[in-house]
């Protein structure tokens, strides 16, 4: 079975500053990764599978206005930003049978690794902001328009919808910075 894309490469090119001469075979794997790794956890298994089946039967979703609104107003901006984060390494580096090489051009200058990281971080943050809008929209409309959002499934491979796009680190211990090392303090409740 062929993979069904929520957005097309042409949509991505139209929505961004990516040059129109970029080969779509470079863009499609990034869209696929974003769809599987970002959009599926946002929507949950049931809603994602239902959306994909609707796209297969009606590619422009004209018969399903709630899904059309979800895709056009919420998922497309989210996917565009996350593809912006996924695409630069794919376009900068090429895997060959002997090595990983950095692509270059005769009349342009490549960016350095720190600039590449900055571009990826900015696009990821913008994608998280857009993803947060998707989640809030789905939560606000889960009782009326998207009941599958609340019931993602019961099988072992079910992906439950995310409740937020942002995550923070976890403090795993009591440590205090001393000089160049760390000193582990005992927990305060032990005497």
Where are each of the predicted segments found?
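Conserved short "hinge" loops at termini or chain/domain junctions
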Residues: 1-76, 90-191
């Amino acid at each position: 079975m062929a993979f069904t894309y929520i957005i097309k490469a042409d949509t991505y090119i139209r929505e961004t500053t990516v040059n129109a001469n970029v080969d779509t075979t470079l863009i499609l794997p990034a869209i696929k990764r974003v769809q599987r790794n970002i959009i599926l956890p946002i929507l949950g298994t049931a809603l994602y599978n239902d959306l994909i089946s609707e796209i297969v039967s009606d590619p422009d979703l004209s018969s399903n206005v709630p899904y059309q609104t979800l895709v056009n107003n919420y998922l497309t901006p989210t996917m565009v930003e996350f593809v912006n984060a996924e695409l630069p390494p794919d376009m900068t580096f090429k895997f060959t049978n002997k090595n990983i090489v950095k692509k270059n051009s005769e009349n342009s200058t490549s960016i350095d690794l720190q600039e590449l990281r900055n571009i990826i971080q900015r696009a990821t943050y913008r994608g998280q902001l857009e993803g947060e809008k998707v989640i809030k929209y789905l939560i606000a409309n889960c009782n009326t328009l998207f009941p599958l959002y609340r019931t993602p499934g019961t099988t072992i491979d079910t992906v439950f919808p995310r409740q937020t796009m942002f995550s923070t680190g976890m403090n795993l211990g009591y440590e205090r910075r001393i000089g160049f090392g760390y000193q582990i303090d005992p927990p305060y409740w032990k005497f």
